Every structure is written in C-alpha cells, then in structure tokens.
C-alpha cells in the first residue's frame, strides 16, 4: 500500500523496505537552517535555481512519458497564473477543500493526501504514462514527505546565506541519505548556493553501523548493506554528474582514442596527454566505487609521506605492500642502486616534502632540522598569508632523481584559500589509471582535508591535472569492465575525529569513512 511509504520503513527485520507502490523524489530550495519561504513566497531570486527545477522535473528518459509534480494548494496558488499548470508535467494538487475545483484543467488532478496521490499515480493510466514523481512543496507536504521511506532522492538548492524565513522543513536524515552529486558553489544576486542531490542508501540508522569503517581495518564491504544498488532512477542530467564519471570517462577516452606507446616497464601502454579532473570535497570524499580502493593503504601511505620516511619496511609491517616491488633487492640492483639496503627507497616524496635540499644518506639517518620543510611552510602560509600565490609543495628535485627508487609521479601541489575553504591542485606527470590514479585522487583529497582541519578551514576543491595519462596493456580488459559496465555508487563521507591541529599528530584511527560500499576489488598487476 502507498501508506507504507509514509509510515515505518521496516517490516520487523530493521532493514527490509516494503514493496513500494510509487516512490518519489523531493525538489526544494532551503537555507542552512532549512528555511524555505517567507509570507508564502521564495525570499530569494535565483534564476539558475528555476532552471535547475525545470530541468530536473521535466527530464525523462522516455520521450513518450512525462513526470508528475505533487504540490499543496498554497504552492499551486503561488505559481503565477500564466505558468499554471506547470507545462510538460502532470500537476497533482493536494487539497481537502471542497471548494477547490480545477478538475477541468488539463494536466491537473486533485488528491486529498500524499497517500492518495501515490496510489493514484501507481494505478492506470499513470503507472505507464508517468516516469518519475517529484514532490515540490509546500512546507506541510515537505514535512510529511522529506524523510519518509518512499523518498528515493532529495534535490536541494542549498543556500549558504542567512535569509529570513517563516516556513521551515526538517533537516535531511543524513544517516540514511548520502550525497550523489553537489555542484561547485555559485553566486547569483549576491547569494552563494549550490545544487546537491542526496539519495537514499539505507532505511535505518542500524544499517549505518556496518557502513562505518575506520581505516584501522579494511574488512570486505558487504554490498548488501546498501538497500539501493542502482541509482539510475535519478534524472539523467543528475545521474551523469556523479564525479566518478570524470574518472570513468577519462579511462574510456584513453582506451578508445589513446596512442599505443612503449614504457620503462616494457609492459606497454595506451595513453593520452594533458587532462584534468575536478572533485568537490565539500559534501563527500572522492573514493572511487566502481572498484574497491585500498583505503587503509591510502591513509597509511600518506601518514608515512608526512612523517618523511623513506623506509618501505615500515609500510610492509602494517600490511601495506604497495612499495615492496620498487624496494626489492632485485629492483634496486636493476637501476644501479646496488649499495642501497633493501626497502630503502631513497629521497622520494616524504623526504622532499619535509627535507628538500638535504643530503640523503640512507633511510636510517636522522634528518631533523635538515633541508627545507615544505609541508610546514605550506601550513604556515595558509594560516598567515592565505592570499599567497606561492603555497606550493614539490616532490620533484632534479638533483636527487638518480637516488630515488622511483622518480615522483605526483610531483607538484599548489594550495588556494577562498571563502574559508582550502583547495588543492596537484600535477601528476605520469598516471597509471588502473592502480595509481584512484589511490592518488584519494590521497591528495585526504591531504587537503587534513591541512584544512589543521588550519581551521573546510575542504573545497581538489583539481587533478595529469600529463601522461595511461592504461597499461595488461589492465585494458579490467578497466574496460569498470568504465563501460559498472555504475557508480555514492561517494562516502569522511570524518576526521582528531582534535589535534598538528599535522604530525594524526593517526590512522583518526579517519573514518561513512557509507563506503564499492563494487568488488579488481586485481591488477603493478608494472615495476
């Protein structure tokens, strides 16, 4: 029954969703304290919001179908007469007033409640002719529908300014909804705002427990934890804005249009030159979902870089073996570092970040006070001179390249402060799209979040600029499967639990992911 969609979401097991008659999506604009109107009107003028509303509620995948919009009587009356009914959509008006008679108006139907509206739309002819159902107001309708089990998604224009309102709706229950997509901030008529779509991923807070994993463990994800596995019910214009499609589209472009090249490892690659991806860190964390990313490895390696260590054995002792190949006896001998102890990687990333210019001897030496500490310099400039255009950290030191087990691939980062937000652009000269790039995206997004935390800022953008973006020939079939067949899920949310403001005080347990439910791990061999 449709009434189940507006009632208790469970059937006794705590996680099983009732068989819906008709679900719906909510479209709303609201301030940070969920104000939506004043004196029966919108207290802001945002033409782009009107366009967004039209695009979301009118878009259908089947040109022979249309969408339905459910609204209360006051919302109907607030629409200018010349725009009533909203064109191209079935207008469902909720009212219990016997004097309200518009039944003769084309493309308009009247229902007494949300329950009766959903039941109507579940029956003939609307079950066939109506593709999606959107709830568009007003306050009482939103309060009834927003967090109810029948709500699959919420498309919200999030207004960051304080604007006086007299009508409010409940906060979105973020224990069961996660961001699918959030636009970069826009400013219109001096109002800063963004468009964010949240999707329902679970029915109850109880399900959240199994989704919340600290990085101290890397247990297998249970794909059954997410009630919804396929989010293609979203309007196409929203569905395709998921930021994972930046990565998937780049992989697809390389496979389809790349140039075949030889490489140092003699594996062979298909590559393109010069590309960029931009990720929004404000609402979610860009840990790819079409294949499982080794999150614990991301965290431990970044903390290892920050410590300035060049000893691969430290990572290996923690079960992180990503540097084992480049630190092996066989590999070090093959590049002429025959006197180097196994596991000693030379003056690579962490050394350059913390001791740039110091003379490298071996991984056991104490380099305290030696060289230039770029990381602390970055933090100092962000705190004391945030408008500086020289907030830069470089791992590329030409005089040390011959001493490194592997010259830096991700070699240069610049930080930028605006509107209380910290953004980072990283340049990567060589990008292994299969194994390296998912790791690199997560690592620099995490670094940005950590520095923002230390500097009392919030994360902004992570911009990933790539020189040679390539797919190794032995990864082609696996990445073809990922980029052409897998559908992304929601990115997780990152919580930093530490109250520490010292970049060197973080521990792996300080970072918690909420709602990471990726597809299965894809085994790919690393080219050494």
Curated annotation (Swiss-Prot):
Where is region (Disordered) located? 1-20
Q: In which pathway does it act?
A: Cofactor biosynthesis; tetrahydrofolate biosynthesis; 5,6,7,8-tetrahydrofolate from 7,8-dihydrofolate: step 1/1
Question: Which residue ranges does the record annotate as region Thymidylate synthase?
Answer: 202-528
List the catalysed reactions. (6S)-5,6,7,8-tetrahydrofolate + NADP(+) = 7,8-dihydrofolate + NADPH + H(+); dUMP + (6R)-5,10-methylene-5,6,7,8-tetrahydrofolate = 7,8-dihydrofolate + dTMP
What are the protein's UniProt keywords?
Answer: Methyltransferase, Multifunctional enzyme, NADP, Nucleotide biosynthesis, One-carbon metabolism, Oxidoreductase, Transferase
tRNA processing as a keyword of this entry, yes or no, is: no
UniProt-listed GO biological process terms: dTMP biosynthetic process; methylation; one-carbon metabolic process; tetrahydrofolate biosynthetic process
Tell me the superkingdom of the source.
Eukaryota
EC number(s) from the headed UniProt entry:
1.5.1.3, 2.1.1.45
Where does the chain bind substrate? 27, 49, 136, 142, 157
Q: Which Gene3D superfamilies match?
A: Dihydrofolate Reductase, subunit A, Thymidylate synthase/dCMP hydroxymethylase domain
**A UniProt-annotated Pfam family:** Thymidylat_synt
Annotated DHFR domain ranges read 23-200
Q: Which residues form the active site?
A: 409
* One cellular component (GO) term of this entry: mitochondrion
MF terms in GO: dihydrofolate reductase activity; thymidylate synthase activity
Binding residues annotated for NADP(+), in chain numbering = 29, 35-41, 73-75, 94-97, 137-144
Could you say which residues bind dUMP here? 264, 410, 428-432, 440, 470-472
Q: Which PANTHER family match?
A: THYMIDYLATE SYNTHASE, THYMIDYLATE SYNTHASE 1
Give the similarity note.
In the N-terminal section; belongs to the dihydrofolate reductase family. In the C-terminal section; belongs to the thymidylate synthase family.
Q: What does this protein do?
A: Bifunctional enzyme. Involved in de novo dTMP biosynthesis. Key enzyme in folate metabolism. Can play two different roles depending on the source of dihydrofolate: de novo synthesis of tetrahydrofolate or recycling of the dihydrofolate released as one of the end products of the TS catalyzed reaction. Catalyzes an essential reaction for de novo glycine and purine synthesis, DNA precursor synthesis, and for the conversion of dUMP to dTMP.
Q: What is the name listed in the Swiss-Prot or TrEMBL entry for this protein? A: Bifunctional dihydrofolate reductase-thymidylate synthase
Q: Which organism is it from?
A: Daucus carota
The upper taxonomy is:
Eukaryota, Viridiplantae, Streptophyta, Embryophyta, Tracheophyta
């Amino acid at each position: 029954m449709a009434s189940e969609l507006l009632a208790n979401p469970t059937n006794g097991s705590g996680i099983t969703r009732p068989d819906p008659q008709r679900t719906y999506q909510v479209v709303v604009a609201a301030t940070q304290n969920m104000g939506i109107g004043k004196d029966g009107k919108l207290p802001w003028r945002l033409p782009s919001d009107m366009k967004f509303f039209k695009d979301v509620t009118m878009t259908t995948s089947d040109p022979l179908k249309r969408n339905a919009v459910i609204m209360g009587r006051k919302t109907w009356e607030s629409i200018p007469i010349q725009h009533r009914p909203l064109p191209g959509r079935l207008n469902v008006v909720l009212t219990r007033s016997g004097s309200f008679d518009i039944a003769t108006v084309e493309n308009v139907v009247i229902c007494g409640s949300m329950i009766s509206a959903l039941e109507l739309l579940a029956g003939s002819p609307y079950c066939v002719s109506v593709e999606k159902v959107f709830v568009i107001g007003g306050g009482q309708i939103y309060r009834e529908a927003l967090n109810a089990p029948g709500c699959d998604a919420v498309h919200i224009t999030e207004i960051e300014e304080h604007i006086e309102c007299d009508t409010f709706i409940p906060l979105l229950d973020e224990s069961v909804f996660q961001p699918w997509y959030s636009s970069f901030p826009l400013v219109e008529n001096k109002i800063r705002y963004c468009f964010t779509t949240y999707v329902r991923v679970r029915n109850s807070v109880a399900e959240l427990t199994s989704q919340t994993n600290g990085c101290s463990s890397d247990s297998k994800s249970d794909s059954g934890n997410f009630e919804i596995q396929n989010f293609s019910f979203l309007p196409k214009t929203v569905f395709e804005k998921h930021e994972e499609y930046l990565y998937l589209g780049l992989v697809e472009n390389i496979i389809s249009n790349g140039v075949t090249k030889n490489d140092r490892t003699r594996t062979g690659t298909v590559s393109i030159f010069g590309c960029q991806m931009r990720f929004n860190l404000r609402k979610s964390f860009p840990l790819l979902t079409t294949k499982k990313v080794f999150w614990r490895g991301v965290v431990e390696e970044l903390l290892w870089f920050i410590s300035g260590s060049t000893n691969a054995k430290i990572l290996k002792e923690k079960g992180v073996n990503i540097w084992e190949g480049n630190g092996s006896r066989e590999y070090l001998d093959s590049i002429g570092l025959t006197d180097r102890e196994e596991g000693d990687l030379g003056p690579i990333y962490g050394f350059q970040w913390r001791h740039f210019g110091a003379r490298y001897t071996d991984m056991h030496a104490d380099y305290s006070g030696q060289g230039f500490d770029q990381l602390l310099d970055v933090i100092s400039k962000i705190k004391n001179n945030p408008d500086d255009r020289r907030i830069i950290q470089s791992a590329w030191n030409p005089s040390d390249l011959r001493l490194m087990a592997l010259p830096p691939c991700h070699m240069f980062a610049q930080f930028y402060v605006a509107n209380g937000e910290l953004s980072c652009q990283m340049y990567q000269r060589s990008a292994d799209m299969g194994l390296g790039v998912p790791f690199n995206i997560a690592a620099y997004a995490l670094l940005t979040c950590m520095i923002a935390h230390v500097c009392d800022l919030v994360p902004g953008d992570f911009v990933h600029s790539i020189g040679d973006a390539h797919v190794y020939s032995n990864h082609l079939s696996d990445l073809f499967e990922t980029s052409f067949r897998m559908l992304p899920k929601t990115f997780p949310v990152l919580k930093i639990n530490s109250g520490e403001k010292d970049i060197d005080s973080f521990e792996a347990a300080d970072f918690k992911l909420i709602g990471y439910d990726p597809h299965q791990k894809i085994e790919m061999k690393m080219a050494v």
